[in-house]
């Protein structure tokens, strides 16, 4: 078996979110190795939880600096989300990456088996409603990518891959072409357009959990739920009433919306369940 593990990116600014994530991850994945990739330098609070939640802390500052340099070329300043690129040069041969604005609702071990068929696997892809969060309409006229490459447009909050699939050298080699497409990228989504570009131009097999389920009819594959979908029901730390198992709940965009409107996030009771999971009762 390959050296397998999972990564998450966080800092102390999102400590509450990180605790909810960690509680949920360890509730369903008690033994898989886990590594924190620092979003920035302010990680003292979350790093102090490493013993309680059994995770390591990324130490290769040079590789994080490399990620920051890439983000500056797209945004003019360092953007912590780009540190996700470091994981292809990390300690795990095969790995899962999960965004921290999630709660994990199942064992993620099944995802590694899909690396027999794929070099890159995300949660969702090939949905027209997602494409606008990766590429602007103008990308088609640019002619640099095929329609299939553009339509892949994956949510990169959940990624399964292996080390050789995206080496730092291969990223460097394709950066000039990626930068040439920057005006066609939805850079308000930070690293997501670049990572999509790197995935679809890597020469490997790429897909998504949703795509695998649809192609094979295997609807027992756990799938991501988006908190913006108001049709879901939750109870006792679970999503209930769905015909497919739930992999995780993702509040992508919903925390920012809640802050802007002064309202609670959707399914706050699910998030609170995991945020308070290890707190003493009474």
Give a label for each model feature.
Residues 1-23:
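N-proximal low-complexity "stem/linker" segments adjacent to membrane-targeting elements
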Residues 1-4, 155, 163, 168-282:
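A glycosyltransferase accessory/donor-loop signature
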Residues 16, 41-47:
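Short, charged/polar "capping" segments at the starts of alpha-helices
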Residues 24-32:
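Short, acidic, metal-binding catalytic loop of nucleotide-sugar glycosyltransferases
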Residues 34-40, 123-124:
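Short internal beta-strands
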Residues 45-90:
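Active-site-proximal specificity loops/subdomain of glycosyltransferases
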Residues 82-132:
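GT-A fold catalytic core of metal-dependent nucleotide-sugar glycosyltransferases
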Residues 113-177:
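Conserved catalytic core of nucleotide-sugar-dependent glycosyltransferases
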């Amino acid at each position: 078996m390959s050296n397998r593990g999972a990564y998450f990116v966080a800092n102390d600014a999102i400590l509450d979110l990180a605790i909810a994530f960690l509680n949920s991850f360890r509730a369903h994945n008690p033994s898989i190795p886990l590594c924190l990739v620092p979003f920035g330098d302010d990680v003292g609070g979350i790093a102090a939880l490493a013993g309680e939640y059994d995770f390591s802390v990324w130490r290769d500052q040079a590789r994080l600096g490399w990620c920051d340099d890439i983000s500056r070329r797209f945004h003019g300043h360092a953007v912590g989300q780009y540190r996700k690129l470091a994981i292809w040069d990390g300690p795990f041969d095969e790995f899962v990456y999960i965004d921290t604005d999630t709660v994990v609702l199942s064992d993620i071990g099944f995802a590694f088996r899909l690396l027999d068929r794929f070099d890159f696997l995300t949660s969702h892809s090939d949905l027209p409603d997602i494409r606008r969060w990766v590429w602007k309409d103008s990308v088609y006229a640019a002619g640099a990518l095929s329609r299939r490459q553009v339509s892949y447009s994956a949510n990169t909050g959940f990624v399964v891959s292996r080390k050789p699939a995206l080496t730092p050298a291969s990223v460097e080699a394709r950066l000039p072409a990626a930068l040439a497409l920057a005006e066609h990228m939805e850079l308000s989504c930070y690293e997501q357009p670049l990572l999509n570009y790197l995935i679809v131009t890597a020469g490997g097999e790429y897909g998504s959990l949703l795509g695998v389920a649809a192609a094979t009819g295997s609807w027992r594959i756990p799938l991501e739920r988006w908190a913006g979908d108001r049709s879901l029901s939750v109870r006792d730390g679970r999503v209930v009433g769905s015909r497919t198992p739930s992999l995780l709940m993702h509040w992508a965009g919903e925390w920012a919306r809640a802050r802007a409107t002064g309202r609670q996030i959707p399914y706050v009771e699910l998030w609170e369940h995991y945020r308070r999971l290890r707190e003493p009762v009474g």
